Amino acid sequence: MLNQKIQNPNPDELMIEVDLCYELDPYELKLDEMIEAEPEPEMIEGLPASDALTPADRYLELFEHVQSAKIFPDSKTFPDCAPKMDPLDILIRYRKVRRHRDFDLRKFVENHFWLPEVYSSEYVSDPQNSLKEHIDQLWPVLTREPQDHIPWSSLLALPQSYIVPGGRFSETYYWDSYFTMLGLAESGREDLLKCMADNFAWMIENYGHIPNGNRTYYLSRSQPPVFALMVELFEEDGVRGARRYLDHLKMEYAFWMDGAESLIPNQAYRHVVRMPDGSLLNRYWDDRDTPRDESWLEDVETAKHSGRPPNEVYRDLRAGAASGWDYSSRWLRDTGRLASIRTTQFIPIDLNAFLFKLESAIANISALKGEKETEALFRQKASARRDAVNRYLWDDENGIYRDYDWRREQLALFSAAAIVPLYVGMANHEQADRLANAVRSRLLTPGGILASEYETGEQWDKPNGWAPLQWMAIQGFKMYGDDLLGDEIARSWLKTVNQFYLEQHKMIEKYHIADGVPREGGGGEYPLQDGFGWTNGVVRRLIGLYGEP
């Protein structure tokens, strides 16, 4: 079963080396099962079949040629293209003609592939509409049907309709969808909520986890595990009963905890890290260590400037994408340099809070079904995780949660991810009060709360504010009795989004909120995106609670 495992170590004598090559690193457990960890695309009868391989694996040197030549400004465009004929025939044709003197790569691609459509570009908003009316009219624009794709593309089939974020993101995304669902519920779109509930349950049943998104190149990783929060929303909104999802929650939990039983202290496998005291915490991970299909050229360039083995950098870039915070100072050794990324060496506060929620949800639903042993087991797991988080990720001196660098055995940076323990009910009241003071003094602006207090040029840092962080902060602080702060964040965010909407007549992915003048957020690997799923969802929910700004 084991390819490599440390024999009879004494944890007290182990000194952690930060930058050992992964293949030789004794603190990274290697199990044979990891080779088979990535699932294959599933077919659904009556729907177009996806390609069995990712675009990079399918088109090989053609893929690298297209990406290196920068035929498209966005590296995601080619992976999202659909072939006009059998993909293998396209590759054979390319190999026959690529060395011809008059070979034109751009024309070859245009002749053999359908370019992805950007549906939202067809939509023109009515300036007379209120913010609420605008959002309600956007839902159909952002809805995709199961049959809305061409055979052999990278798009994974789903059994029901789904919402996409918009812009370059023409597929559904895991954690985005939860925040989008908040708005669907407020808009009375229970039909779409049911469809999305069925889709996510189907993905867990067929893939063993919910992929980052429904693309073949996303199958090797997930995103922040918010399915337990979705189930809670389905129950509250009367869409689906929570009991029907107990097995799905257990399956997702097994995915995140895979290999835990084989670990010794100071050792990790996939998503799990066993801490020096034997407790278990989690990290973000991707089962591949190659450049991301959708950001291939950017990843290759980043690795060139890292001074590390490229596959190590690719893994950390992929894990950063799995975090949803792609990218942020949270994952960087040098906050000004993406090439210093070390995502897999950090224990994230938000991930472990979401997993606490997952453990608690399994316990609660097991109790409803009379499964007392399962309830007791998962209550114990949730309690153990909370204790470990308090031991390693709570900064008592400053009254904040922080990520933890498990390779250097020290606390990492403070960010708005620290509010997730409040949102899932993991903090005590003293922690909530102290964290509120820190957020007020370090992250709060007239436009909402910043992603972090560090200005790095990455999109999940200052000066940007993001809808999901506002929602979790608002609800988290109110849950612990700080209505004043929760309401202030809510009204500030509504003002930000509405002011921008009145000027530009659109909703966007992120907002620059550092100086009190709302404008387009920047940073990251791609241009700012319109749409935008989770902004619409959070704002629509807030309008239901606070009225139109």
Swiss-Prot record:
The active site is at residues 326, 509. One of its GO terms (cellular component) is cytoplasm. Substrate binds at residues 168, 175-176, 212, 221-223, 292-294, 324, 525. GO terms for molecular function: alpha,alpha-trehalase activity. It is found in: Cytoplasm. Its EC number is 3.2.1.28. It is an enzyme of class 3 (hydrolase). Pfam families: Trehalase (PF01204). Pathway: Glycan degradation; trehalose degradation; D-glucose from alpha,alpha-trehalose: step 1/1. Keywords: Cytoplasm, Glycosidase, Hydrolase. GO terms for biological process: cellular hyperosmotic response; trehalose catabolic process. It catalyses: alpha,alpha-trehalose + H2O = alpha-D-glucose + beta-D-glucose. Monomer. Hydrolyzes trehalose to glucose. Could be involved, in cells returning to low osmolarity conditions, in the utilization of the accumulated cytoplasmic trehalose, which was synthesized in response to high osmolarity. Belongs to the glycosyl hydrolase 37 family. This is Cytoplasmic trehalase. It comes from Escherichia coli O139:H28 (strain E24377A / ETEC). The lineage of its organism: Bacteria, Pseudomonadati, Pseudomonadota, Gammaproteobacteria, Enterobacterales. The gene is treF.
